[in-house]
UniProtKB/Swiss-Prot annotation:
Pathway: Amino-acid biosynthesis; L-histidine biosynthesis; L-histidine from 5-phospho-alpha-D-ribose 1-diphosphate: step 6/9. This is Imidazoleglycerol-phosphate dehydratase. It comes from Synechococcus sp. (strain CC9311). GO terms for cellular component: cytoplasm. It holds the Pfam family IGPD. It is an enzyme of class 4 (lyase).
């Protein structure tokens, strides 16, 4: 079982993440940010990732610090679970619809953090959640997991649908990239024989 566990404490937040890549999609998420919890359930359920996340933070100010720090801890736990990335497929791609919304995610477990962002979310809020925090979450994940991540919105007008389709596509692409390739025979999926590791500290 490939797992990663992180407990991260700052002056603004206290975040614990336990992540299992070879799971069944069990999720317990309690971050104090209800919409973020809903999206973490999408990652777990559709990626078949077992996920336990708890967070407390200065949400009396706003959700920014908690949202970002959950992304940081998730990325670090993912990097730990992947280890040296031996035997994985490495690349993943998925296009997810949700009613009128359609979002494409392509990713590479390369060890080289990069995000190319292509969502246009029409409203500033989804419930109480500030929609600019969606990008901040993924930036934090990418910088601490070493993913190369491309996100493209192909269609959509409803903010909730667009964001949820994004998280669903991300989860399925991540599942594809991190599953074990039986033909790889435990080797690192790189012509160099090594992939960089990120987010360990």
């Amino acid at each position: 079982m490939r797992t990663g566990e992180i407990h991260r404490v700052t002056g603004e937040t206290d975040v614990s993440v336990r992540l299992g890549l070879d799971g069944s999609g069990r999720c317990q998420a309690s971050t104090g940010v209800p919409f973020l919890d809903h999206m973490l359930h999408q990652i777990s359920s559709h990626g078949l990732i077992d996920l336990e996340i708890t967070a407390s933070g200065d949400t009396h100010i706003d959700d920014h610090h908690t949202n970002e720090d959950v992304g940081i801890a998730f990325g670090q736990a993912l990097s730990k679970a992947l280890g040296d990335r031996r035997g994985i497929y490495r690349f993943g791609h998925f296009v997810a619809p949700l009613d009128e919304a359609l979002v494409q995610v392509v990713l590479d477990c390369s060890g080289r953090p990069h995000i190319s962002w292509g969502l246009t979310i029409p409203t500033q809020k989804i419930g109480t959640y500030d929609t600019e925090l969606v990008k901040e979450f993924f930036v934090a994940v990418v910088n601490n997991s070493g993913l190369t991540l491309h996100i493209r919105q192909l269609d959509g007008v409803n903010s909730h649908h667009i964001v949820e389709a994004c998280f669903k596509a991300f989860s399925r692409a991540l599942r594809m990239a991190t599953e074990i390739d039986p033909r790889r025979s435990g080797l690192v999926p790189s012509s160099k024989g090594v992939l960089e590791q990120a987010g360990g500290s």
